[in-house]
Amino acid sequence: VRPDPTPHASPTALPGYAATGRIDELRASEYRHLDTDGQVYLDYAGAGVAAQARVRAHHDRLLAGLYSNPHSENPTSVAAGSLVGSARRAVLDFFRADPDEYTVIFTPNASGACRLVGEAYDFGRTAPLVLTWDNHNSVNGIREYARSARASVRYLPLNGPELRVAESDLVAVLDAGSGGLARRWGRPGRRGLFAYPAQSNFSGVQHPLGWVELAQQRGYDVLLDAAAFAPTNRLDLSVVRPDFVCLSWYKLFGYPTGVGALLARRSALARLRRPWFAGGTIRAVSVQGDWHRPMDDESAFEDGTLNFLSIPDVEFGLRWLDSIGVDLVHARVGLLTEWLLERLATLRHDTGGPLVQVYGPMTGAGRGGTVTFNLRHPDGTLVDERLVAREAATAGLSLRTGCFCNPGAAEGAFGMSRTSMRQRLLAGVDTIDQYLAALGLPTGGAVRISFGLASIATDAERLVDFVQSTYLNRSAGTESPLPPRLRC
């Protein structure tokens, strides 16, 4: 589908935009700090933005009560434990998860949730790990646990310019996996793990939630990375039932940081075997007897003392998001994304060449509010993303550049092959820039912008104005030297 060559002059002119007007009202009241000093925030995939009401609620709660370590039974401990328990129930309620089927484990972040699953999963020769190229490094890292257990690790490639996984490839890999063999051999206890993101943090592609059931029918547990999906999309666990869901709360509503969650089906959680124990995770332990008994609920996975002063803020954030409406946020983000893609597609140099190269879908279908792209000079060469980061910062735009901790999606977007990467590594390179030069890549990353709960039309318009006024018809070789790349 080709973008409309004459897009609307402003997102506000789009059909349906007026129906999302409450977002504009909230921006002017609860999120007015976003407009301080002419800043434009375009990194919701990196972190959400806290409403002023959230900060006030945290302040008021701490001043009105006294709370202490919930691992005790004194009044202040009971008060803290009560708030933590209320937050657990709020999480299940928000995601429409049956408390008899699901439980909530609080973690430091989504990465911590992934690690809990990886370190405790029963991998082995007949329990493989299946991943997509399009995964955050916190999910990719699970492969190290699988390999240490001598399990096979299979990756599903991305196809075409939209950077999607072909479902036929997924079915073929799942059917060929040892999980299916184990079932045929009459060993239903040993399963495989399939881990993928509901939404790509690189391209914004939304991978089908129907893959959860597809994999489970083939004997796999499913870990769904919802960190990029949940802030602007409804995840209903009464309809889609992954075995594990990883989340970071600051990505949903900006605050608190340092708190994430693993939502786990109780049946899947019972199959995990933790390699160690810590304070708060055990019912009893003996030093001389060399034995321990883990707790029999979610606390067996919550190491040490929980962040009991911040976890109650999760409940406030969920109530806040629910009062606004996830569907309303989804609609606003979809409109801004569609408009931006149309506008970027119309930007062309006087040479006729495109100014913007988008990685991923060029329409709003099957994607979220994350748009990743590179800019091109009139001669077709790429503008270094480090230059864009520097000049965007000067213009007051907060965006992201690099590979966004998603190397597989970047490799797919830039057309990098496994053979070429291995050859370059064997040749010996010491720096990121040397590696990129050896691969023949014109740049080491891309530019990512993302919309979220408080995004408004002027955010998208300011971005387009910046791109057009700064890079349209700008020749290569006019930039000042850039610092070396220290990481992707």
Residue ranges and their predicted role:
Residues V1-C488:
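Pyridoxal 5′-phosphate
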